[in-house]
Amino acid sequence: MIERAYSQFETSDKNLNSAYKDLLTKYRNYPNFIKKLKIAQRLWIKYRDALIDMEFPSDEPRLDYGSVYPFCVLAFKTKLTKKRTTELLNYMNYEEGNVCAGGPVD
């Protein structure tokens, strides 16, 4: 069970890293966008870890949640990672001419 959960997390993490690298490549000529993307991604990792801590707030999680705790953390982390990957992929196709959609500028 834990091996499968870990494998699913690894796959989602690889997909996230791939989407991130694709953005870095696609927008390499937009240094301000790249700079802010890197900041946002570092903050997202902190946010993800804080959400996990909030989801399982115990100081002794293995005692309070039992042996299933590592599985639960991996499942939650996978869910958050998949969501973030979707968010990053949305930046691959900005709607041209829609200023409110944001996006890299010269």
PLM feature segments, named:
Residues M1-D106:
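N-terminal alpha-helical modules
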